[in-house]
Amino acid sequence: MIKTNLEKNGLFISVKILAVFMIIFFGIVLIPKYGAADPPHIDEIVNRLQQVYERTQDFQAGFIQETTVKSIRKTDTEEGVVYFKNPRQMLWDYKKPKAKKLIINAQKAWLYLPKDKTVYVQESDKIFKSEALIKFLSGLGKLNDDFKIQYATPHATDKEGNYLLQLYPREKGASYQYLQMTVAKNNFHILQVSFDDVMGNSTHLIFSGIKMNAGLSSKLFQFQPPAGVSIFKMP
């Protein structure tokens, strides 16, 4: 039996948030260094995010994801590798505790659950239905137009001096209230990101082994359902 709340809804609904996160991630990892006692003005951060995203081609990293589903009061911890390539291509390749893949390109989005021999498929435009998100994934979006970005309050840094940022979507009806990120003070890699979706489910991500502009092939973001699997079309 497929656990639809966790597998189908949890991944397909939150993918919009994950996609926005990957866009912001591209910029933060390459921002110049600043002293912990002298954080840059937030406008400088935003401008740099925009510049770096526009010239970033691809990204990959290992991740640990903790997802709490409010309706069943359950927290699952998963591990895998995430890949992103401009424009509009993503792969979340989950390895532990069980394998699954979320593959997205400009045409389709697939959620493949090998153990259940099941594939869910949806038109990618229905995943990326936010106008702001589509603009970003096409390299045309403007951070200041689509997000209000600020340092977290009451503290802009954690006890190690890492930067704490909050990103609020300007779009009405967004699937989340805001994203909160912990950004390393020494190299501006993202250490953690957290968000709650509109249903009260929470996600916490930790990244490692970051590789930028490695020349990822677009073939990585193609998917052919294996023989013998059940395929379900999502509305």
Language model regions located:
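An acidic-aromatic
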Residues: 81-131, 203-204
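Bacterial N-terminal signal peptides
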Residues: 16-29
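Gly/Pro-enriched, hydrophobic low-complexity segments
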Residues: 145-235
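Extracytoplasmic
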Residues: 56-58, 77-79, 87, 97, ...
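N-terminal leader/targeting segments and the immediate start of mature chains
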Residues: 2, 29-74, 225-235
